[in-house]
Amino acid sequence: MRDLVEVVALAALIYLLIAFAIQPVHVEGTSMYPGLQNNNLLIAEKVSLYFGGPSRGDVVIIKPPIASTNDFIKRVIGLPGEWLRIAPNSHHVGHVYISDTRPTSLTGGIQLNEPYVSGVWQDEVECCTAAGTFSPLLPTSGKWVHIPAHDYFVMGDNRNFSEDSRTFGFEPQSGIRGVAVARFWPLDRLGLVPGERPTFSVVLAAGTLLPVRRLRRRRSRDRSSDRLPAPK
C-alpha cells in the first residue's frame, strides 16, 4: 500500500511539474540553426512567465500561429511597446533596429547585436517575404512597426528558413508556453540554450541538469576502471 501511495505521489508531482513548471521540447526543423539543431531535446521552464513576460533574446515555445499540431520555437527580438525595423540593403542583410520611442530622422534606433545568428546565414538573410514585403499584418520592409502592448516580435535564428513574426505577425504573450533554457540531448551538447543569460531560468535548468551531469561523470569513471593496465 505504501508503494502505491509513493507511485501516485510521484506521478502527481511529475504532472504538476509538466503542467506548471517545466516541459520537454523536441526541436523539429532547422529554423533555429546553428544554435539548435533538428532532433535536439530541450527543457523549457514556465515559472518565470507567471511573474512577467520573456526577455529579449529568450528562446520561447509558442502556440502554432497557423494550422499545425506542433509548437513553434523562436527567439524574442522585439518587446511590447517597442518600435522595430528590419533594414534591407544591397546584400539583403536584415539588420534589426529597436527603439523605445517613435523614431524620427534624428533617432534611428539601436541596431541589435545578434551573435546567435550565424555569419554564414546572416549574409543571405532576406528582409521579409519572397515578394519583398512583410505579411499583410505588417507594412513593407524597411518601415518601422510598433509592437502592441502584450505582444512580441519573434524570429528564428536561421533567418532564411524560418516562419516567424515576419510572416504570421506579432506573438501575444498569452501564446508563449515556455522559455527554453537547457539542452539535454545529444549528451555531447548538454548545457544551456545558446544565447541564454544567467537568470532564474538558468538556475532552474542547472538544477534539472545536475543529475544528468553526475550520471555522465559516474559512467566515465566506470568505463575507465574497466580498462586494463598498460603493459610494463
Where are the language model's segments positioned?
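Soluble "head" domains of membrane/secretory-pathway proteins
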Residues: D3-E6, A11, L17-H26, M32-K232
